[in-house]
Design a protein with these regions (language model features):
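A short catalytic or substrate-binding loop motif that flags glycine-/basic-rich loops and adjacent residues
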Residues: 1-2, 149
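DPxDG-like acidic metal-binding loop motif
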Residues: 14, 108, 115
Length: 250
């Protein structure tokens, strides 16, 4: 972490993650896409356990870790400038797991924060929140595992704050809980379009809160270590202006 361009430790409850962000100084020859790698490494010691294998090694990534990588990649990737082709790696290591608070949304917010202090060109900060819909018909922000399981529906929303103070939603991931149908049979409140619309509005408060915390972090880093030096990079054009003009005329 000390050698990374940006490193952040974030926590919710006793769940804690370390996220680092790094980018190559030069572009590899022939690179015609943005090589962004997002990795989430879950460690057994985070939950106070030691792997039981002979060599005490960690196993392959879990399904949850892979899904968290994809969930993190979605709002991050379009937030880099056009033409940026430097290989970039965002790595999150789960260093504490309290078995109550999930680390996936925390990882996205930590990734945004790490990029904000790294000097890597990034149009952030981004804020992300998970909201669970309870059987009583209330949206619960940043729910615990138990609150999500006892709810009928949950939604993960990522966004950025606009100049006018509104929030532009960049990603929505939603789905019903495993026992939702049983809860509905017992009379639980159902999720309608109006209810989802309320969630998209309510989430903006929590997204802004995450963004505000990241801006406070940036200000603290600048106050302690001086201005964040932006990395030097040159946009890679996929085509010349002449080719673009010719295609427009077709």
């Amino acid at each position: 972490a000390p050698n990374s361009m940006g490193a952040v430790v974030a926590s919710i409850g006793a769940t804690q993650v370390l996220t680092t962000a790094n980018a190559a100084k030069s572009v590899r020859d022939g690179m015609d896409f943005f090589p962004l790698t997002v990795d989430v490494e879950e460690r057994a010691y985070a939950a106070g356990k030691i792997p039981g294998s002979f060599f005490r090694r960690e196993g392959r990534p879990t399904e949850d870790a892979i899904l968290t990588c994809r969930l993190t990649d979605r709002p991050l990737r379009p937030s880099f400038p056009d033409g940026f082709r430097h290989e970039t790696q965002v790595v999150t290591t789960v260093i504490g797991a309290d078995q109550e608070n999930p680390h996936d949304v925390l990882s996205i917010n930590a990734a945004s924060a790490a990029l904000m202090i790294s000097g890597i060109p990034f149009d952030g900060p981004l804020g992300t929140v998970r909201m669970a819909y309870s059987q009583e018909g209330e949206w619960i922000p940043h729910p615990t595992y138990e609150e999500s399981e006892n709810g009928t529906f949950e939604i993960v929303i990522a966004g950025r704050e606009l100049e006018d103070g509104d929030v532009a939603v960049m990603m929505v991931e939603a789905g019903g809980s495993e026992n939702a149908f049983y809860y509905y049979d017992d009379g639980a409140k159902k999720v309608t379009e109006e209810v989802l619309g309320d969630a998209l509005q309510a989430c903006k408060v929590w997204i802004k809160e995450s963004i505000a915390l990241q801006r406070q972090l940036v200000a603290s880093v600048i106050a302690t270590h001086g201005p964040i030096e932006p990395m030097s990079w040159t946009p890679v054009l996929d085509y010349t202006s002449e080719i673009f003009d010719a295609v427009e005329k077709i």
